[in-house]
Amino acid sequence: MARKYFGTDGVRGRVGELPITPEFVMRLGYAAGVTLVAREHLPAGERPAILIGKDTRVSGYMLEAALQAGFAAAGVDVLLAGPIPTPAVAYLTRALRLQAGVVISASHNPFYDNGIKFFSAGGAKLPDAVEAEIEERIGQPMGCAESARLGRARRIGDAAGRYIEFCKSSFPNELDLRGLRIALDCAHGAAYHIAPNVFHELGAEVISVGVDPNGLNINDGVGATRPENLRQAVLSHGADLGIALDGDGDRLIMVDRQGEIYDGDKLLYVIASARAAEGRLDGVVGTLMSNLGFEHALERRGVAFARAKVGDRYVLEMLHERGWKIGGENSGHIICLDCHTTGDGIISALQVLAALKHREMSLSEACKDLVFYPQRLINVRLPAGFDWKADARIAQTAADAERTLGDTGRVLLRPSGTEPLLRVMVEGRDEQLVESLARGIAGAVELAVAG
């Protein structure tokens, strides 16, 4: 069944507009509670319980209350963790033996957006089929459990501390971060009170920015999607490197001491090449957006590479299908299944630092064999219901570009899973040609939209 509300990363939208309204989110909580508990087959007498975490958006208070009401009506107890990174919810759901976890966040989006995403009892994002089942229940009348079976809610005070220790446990015992000065940008998001403690407790000198959330400033000129802020912090403070997370803490971008920015492909290469050298890497999963240079660099090391659809959920699915442990996206979602069940910005940063420490290398030295092809990405806004695949002009322009590039590049057109955008990506060895072809395709899309 096709999903109406769920995108590549849960249900997301502008606050106050469907589906991110209090009424809809309450119905979503009820539908999810009924669906997820029914799939768990609890022993008789055991009460179902679900964890709710959120980022620092002001709308999180409203949506948390709405979700809580929906779960309570379904007879589900709720544990409220407060502001906490998305991967922390995945970990705590599993560690506390709960039936599911829920995150209220729109990740890297502005404060006026928000979203809801779910984790299974095992700490993994829900399969498409389960999300479709939840959607089907949303369309049915909302019920209410008997009074004696209504859900209860309580706050858990040690969520942050538990997660800090979990993150630190992913870093090798024989290593520490003493002598390292790290600039850390938490995007005024969910990791603001957690990430600085992780790196400090491992011995680093931490220069923190983006750690003063006010409900409105999440991702505003800071974080993994705005790495220039981190770059300036690294250069002005003479840091050895910089680490940027996004609003919900599952995305990672880094900066070296010279101010060069390292995206997800480069950081994944650092982790993968270190593990390949240790003989503990079977293969790497990237996405359709992963740079060809990244794929070729892995091939030179004899490392198998496969491309999943864009979205960390699809990277995770392919990792499980192939029995591999490492994968990610150039956007900074990196998954290390030998450390966590989902992508985690803090843990991914620790894996990069461990690789550099073990090999006694800097970021630039670890990436010296990695030569990226120029890649141009242009986002074109699409009106609701516009069928770009059926437009002959768009198809012809894209086909012409592919013929021009031949075996030296790629063309990719794909709709965003979270916004009304068509992403036009062109990649090749000649930067000027790549730019020209990308602009040509984007122009064809704009003309088609204009009619």
UniProtKB/Swiss-Prot annotation:
GO terms for cellular component: cytosol. The keyword Magnesium applies. SUPFAM superfamilies: Phosphoglucomutase, C-terminal domain, Phosphoglucomutase, first 3 domains. Pfam families: PGM_PMM_I, PGM_PMM_II, PGM_PMM_III, PGM_PMM_IV. It catalyses: alpha-D-glucosamine 1-phosphate = D-glucosamine 6-phosphate. Binds 1 Mg(2+) ion per subunit. GO terms for biological process: carbohydrate metabolic process; peptidoglycan biosynthetic process; UDP-N-acetylglucosamine biosynthetic process. Its cofactor is Mg(2+). Keywords: Isomerase, Magnesium, Metal-binding, Phosphoprotein. CDD domains: GlmM. Activated by phosphorylation. The keyword DNA repair does not apply. It is an enzyme of class 5 (isomerase). GO terms for molecular function: magnesium ion binding; phosphoglucosamine mutase activity; phosphomannomutase activity. PROSITE patterns: PGM_PMM. Its EC number is 5.4.2.10. InterPro entries: A-D-PHexomutase_a/b/a-I, A-D-PHexomutase_a/b/a-I/II/III, A-D-PHexomutase_a/b/a-II, A-D-PHexomutase_a/b/a-III, A-D-PHexomutase_C, A-D-PHexomutase_C_sf, A-D-PHexomutase_CS, Alpha-D-phosphohexomutase_SF. The modification Phosphoserine is found at residue 107. Mg(2+) binds at residues 107, 246, 248, 250. The active site is at residue 107. Catalyzes the conversion of glucosamine-6-phosphate to glucosamine-1-phosphate. Belongs to the phosphohexose mutase family. This is Phosphoglucosamine mutase. It comes from Azoarcus sp. (strain BH72).
